[in-house]
Curated annotation (Swiss-Prot):
Belongs to the cytochrome P450 family. CDD domains: CYP64-like. This is Cytochrome P450 monooxygenase FrzL. GO terms for cellular component: membrane. Its EC number is 1.-.-.-.
């Protein structure tokens, strides 16, 4: 009896010992696992000088083809694991989102330029959740539908500008600038050249340039401890932060004084807004107006595809003519009735991804995948360029084939990201892009531009460089499809003076 009681008393200690031994064994086993393979590295700099400044995502794809769907690239002292297949990205960034839903530490752009206030760069935690709740109130499905009255009005103005102007890149940018400034600040701006909008756009351009130079402090974090005299990026970044702060504060003050409804006023009613200070709230709301480039880049790719792939355009125009006819413009009520147009837009975003290099994620804890070790705190990036041209997922991936999305509705679209880090403004982007694309295809036929009888060729691989990547400027010909289409456009798009205040107040009434 005594022996049995002694043994029973020993059981809890034995269980703890076995658990500890198992944990140590598991950790040692995991530590013995290698990092994912990758190109040979040089001492100290790693692969820093093997990564080209132009189109680095193409180099990553070449490395994926050589080393596999998950590779390690070392920039200075920092390891980055790059994912090159849909399966790897879904397995880690979606299915294991709890471990990969954070962001790495962005020293230059995150800490210095944005003062730790940029939502998209924050690590997962309470602050990020507060930011996300505020932005979700602005851009969720329901609120985006409330904004359709504004998309409708501004898309008609866009058609008029293209009809009478000839250029399309600037009108596309004006369109998104007007929408986001009206919704956020209750301001009517004429477009990207408007002084109030230009200030934000110019500072974003500078930020993106600084971000592209951030490889030194990010690759060698120890340099962050240098005094300002030896780290000139710190002074530049501090000046940008001060410019940001003044600009966003001025816009917020003006928004609260403006008569019509705007989201700044709406945000102050949110409980989440009371959990951040005024400077932080200014940055959260200001980030909305910094997102004007992405939509215009998608529409630039859309026009390029229209010219280079006339057969695909004929298919979608036949669908539009069948559903809508020549007597009215397309509307949001038609969205569900235009599956080929929706497939066309999915293909536009796959064929030339505007975030080809993806956005960095970070691992919370040590992990194991495909027999490889992924250490805690590692930067993990989904290379959209590799994934969108993955032959195992997309047949003939370099071909522009919208019908692939009809044939297989389960094909993965990654344009807006992964997991909890999916773009909070995606519903606004989808709706505002859809209505413009539908109305452009209803209104115009598209062709190459000609100068002195010579066709102006378009290089579909000639894209801008940076965090976002859109087409380099090219010329195109827009021709009204028929006199009837012209008549409808004159009737529907002829009003030059929109009552933005009335539109915003109508949107605001839906929030009450």
């Amino acid at each position: 009896m005594y022996y049995r009681e002694t043994m029973l008393a020993f059981v809890p200690y034995l269980a703890v010992f076995v658990a500890c031994y198992g944990l140590v064994y598991y950790r040692r086993k995991r530590q013995r696992l290698p990092l994912p393979p990758g190109p040979p590295q040089l001492p100290l700099v790693g692969n820093l000088y093997q990564i080209p400044e132009m189109n680095p995502w193409r180099t990553y794809r070449e490395w994926h083809q050589k080393y596999g769907p998950i590779i390690t690239v070392k920039s200075g002292l920092t390891n980055t694991i790059i994912l090159g297949s849909h399966k790897a990205a879904r397995d880690l960034l979606d299915k294991r989102n709890r471990n990969y839903g954070s962001r790495p530490h962005f020293i230059l752009i995150g800490d210095f330029i944005y003062g730790g206030n940029q939502t998209s760069l924050l690590p997962t935690g309470q602050r990020w959740r507060i930011h996300r709740r505020i932005l979700s109130a602005f851009g969720n499905v329901r609120t985006s539908q409330r904004y359709r009255i504004l998309y409708d009005a501004e898309s008609k103005r866009l058609l008029r500008e293209i009809l009478h102007g000839g250029d399309f890149f600037e009108p596309f940018h004006h369109y998104f600038v007007r929408i986001l400034f009206a919704l956020t600040y209750g301001k009517r701006v004429t477009g990207s050249h408007d002084p109030e909008a230009r200030d934000v756009i110019e500072i974003v351009d500078v930020v993106l340039k600084e971000a592209s130079r951030s490889s030194v402090p990010e690759a060698f974090p120890i340099l962050n401890s240098l005094p300002g005299a030896l780290a000139p990026w710190k002074r530049r970044a501090q000046l940008l932060f001060e410019q940001h702060s003044r600009l966003f504060d001025n816009h917020m003050n003006a928004a609260l004084a403006n008569k019509p409804w705007n989201f700044c006023k709406q945000a102050l009613r949110l409980k989440a807004s009371s959990e951040v200070d005024r400077v932080e709230l200014n940055f959260i709301l200001g980030s909305i107006t910094e997102a004007t480039h992405s939509g215009s880049m998608v529409l630039g790719v859309f026009i390029m595809a229209n010219i280079l792939h006339p057969d695909a355009v004929r298919w979608v125009q036949e669908e539009i003519d069948r559903v809508i006819g020549p007597d009215r413009l397309p509307s949001f009520d038609d969205m569900a009735k235009l599956p080929y147009l929706n497939a066309y837009l999915l293909e536009v975003m796959r064929w030339r991804p505007i975030t080809p290099g993806g956005m960095p994620h970070a691992s919370f804890q040590d992990d194991e995948y495909m027999g490889y070790h992924i250490p805690k705190g590692t930067t993990v990036v989904a290379n959209h360029w590799s994934m969108d041209f993955d032959e195992s997922v997309f047949t003939d991936p370099y071909e522009f084939r919208p019908q692939r999305w009809i044939e297989d509705p389960n094909l993965p679209s990654i344009a807006f990201g992964f997991g909890t880090r999916i773009c909070p403004g995606r519903h606004i982007a989808e709706s505002s892009i859809f209505i413009v694309a539908a109305r452009l295809l209803w209104s115009f036929n598209f062709d190459y531009a000609y100068e002195d009888g010579k066709r102006q060729e378009i290089d579909s691989w000639n894209m801008t460089q940076g965090l976002d990547s859109g087409p380099m400027p090219f010329k195109a010909s827009f021709k009204i499809r028929s006199p009837k289409h012209q008549e409808v456009m004159d009737r529907e798009c002829g009003v030059s003076d929109l009552d933005i205040d009335a539109i915003l107040d109508k949107i605001g009434a839906d929030f009450l």
